[in-house]
Each structure stands twice: as structure tokens, then as C-alpha cells.
Design a protein with these regions (language model features):
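Ligand-binding pockets and gating/stacking loops
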Residues: 1-249
Length: 249
């Protein structure tokens, strides 16, 4: 058991299924370096994020989806930028792929108007041929990562739309998570995370903004903003823990 805020009534029922990490400390007080320290182990740019290390070490179980996926919500971006899910000095193929909870989860996942699959494949093959020639000349390993990323992008156009469409989930699942397909929300991303894990994505890390509760506006104030954020996460994270367990994940 553990003490839980009264603003997380659903979560309080499953605390025995959760690990609490209390041994962390930091001398970083600004947002960006603190975010980098937490995600990469160092307060300066250039180190791989935790998801990159896991994917580098363990690989992925699904060759048609990235091994490291980053659903984002909250309407803002980290102060440290994409470095919080970057690959640092590892090949860029291990960096996180950002997903949104509204609109197309991944930008440019659909073929442009007037381009069919055969034409898209031919264009990627042509680009990769140029990259292969460039690699033969310069032997830069990052060129190989670029080739892999183009191939992954093509595969994702087939696999991603189905996996990332939460609208086809049963009604009881939407009720359990509190999801509303088509609208930007943390809950939608939590359900998406479960679907991605089911499909063999090795590392899924959710980022949600709006927790800096010391501003002057109502949504930034501790009395209002903090309670609202708790309300947004309480039901869905509880559902995720329960759902993963019942599916043997």
C-alpha cells in the first residue's frame, strides 16, 4: 500500500500493482536541464534517452513499427525539445517516434494525393539507391540509419493506421479508459500505448504537459489546474494497469 492523493480515487485502488521510485534527487532546478537529466542521465545535450538505450539493447518485436514510440499530449513541447526522446550518440534509428492523439498520429503517414503505393515504393527505392551510393563513398553509419528510416516509414504506412486507430475499440474499453476518439487527450494516448505494446513495440513513453502548477492563470494554479490534471489521468492510468494485467502484458 501507499498514500495516494484524494484527487486520484481510481488510482488509489491499484497502488499494489505499481512500483514507487523514491530514491531520486537532483541539483537541476531549471526545466530543460532537469528534463534531460531525468530522461538521459545527464543535464547536457548529446546523451541517448532511456527509450533509445532500451531499444538499442533489446531491439523490437515488430519490424513494421518503430521500437520506441512517444505519444504526446498537453499542447506543449518539452523545454529540452526532442532530445528527451532522442538517440544522442547512438544511431538515429533508435530515437523515439512522436505520435499525436488528434489527427494523424504520425505526420505524413498517408501518401500524398495522386501517389499510389507503387509510386511511393519506387521513390523510396530511388532515394535509398542514392543513399547506398553515398554510403559506399563516405562510410558514414548515419546513412545506413537514414536508409532504415525510409524503409520503416514505408512499412508504417501499412501497419500504423490500424494500430493507431483507437475508434475501433469496444465501447466498454472507451468507458474504462475515458477515451474520446478524435479529440486530443492523454487518455487517448494511454489506450494507444496499450495497443502499441500489444503489437510488439518495445518502449512506449507518454509525455503530457500542464503539471507546472504555480502560474497565475486558473489552469496553471495548484487549486484548479492540478486537480484538473489529476482528473485527466486518474481513470485512464488505472485502466491501463488493469488492462495490461488482464491481457498478460
Amino acid at each position: 500500500g501507499a498514500w495516494v492523493s484524494e484527487h486520484l480515487p481510481h488510482f488509489s485502488k491499484i497502488v499494489d500493482e505499481v512500483s514507487f521510485l523514491k530514491a531520486c534527487s537532483s541539483d537541476q532546478f531549471n526545466h530543460a536541464p532537469a528534463q534531460l537529466l531525468m530522461q538521459t542521465g545527464g543535464a547536457r545535450l548529446g546523451r541517448p534517452s532511456i527509450g533509445s538505450w532500451v531499444t538499442y539493447g533489446l531491439g523490437t518485436e515488430n519490424q513494421n513499427l518503430p521500437g520506441f514510440v512517444v505519444p504526446t499530449s498537453g499542447g506543449k513541447f518539452p523545454d529540452a525539445g526532442k532530445s528527451v526522446w532522442g538517440s544522442g550518440f547512438l544511431p538515429s534509428v533508435y530515437q523515439g517516434v512522436q505520435c499525436r492523439s488528434e489527427g494523424d498520429p504520425v505526420l505524413f503517414i498517408k501518401d500524398p494525393a495522386g501517389m499510389d503505393r507503387d509510386l511511393r515504393k519506387a521513390s523510396i527505392d530511388a532515394i535509398n539507391k542514392v543513399n547506398e551510393d553515398e554510403y559506399k563513398e563516405y562510410k558514414d553509419p548515419e546513412i545506413l540509419s537514414r536508409i532504415s528510416q525510409y524503409e520503416m516509414a514505408y512499412k508504417m504506412q501499412i501497419a500504423a493506421p490500424e494500430v493507431m486507430d483507437i475508434s475501433k475499440e469496444p465501447e466498454y474499453i472507451h468507458e474504462m479508459y475515458g477515451t474520446k476518439p478524435g479529440k486530443e487527450s492523454f487518455a487517448n494516448n494511454v489506450l494507444l500505448a496499450r495497443k502499441l505494446v500489444e503489437k510488439g513495440v518495445r518502449f512506449v513513453q507518454l509525455f503530457d504537459w500542464g503539471w507546472d502548477s504555480h502560474g497565475a492563470g486558473s489552469e496553471d494554479a495548484l487549486e484548479i489546474g492540478f486537480k484538473n490534471k489529476c482528473r485527466q489521468i486518474d481513470k485512464c492510468i488505472t485502466a491501463l494497469i488493469f488492462d495490461l494485467k488482464q491481457r498478460g502484458l
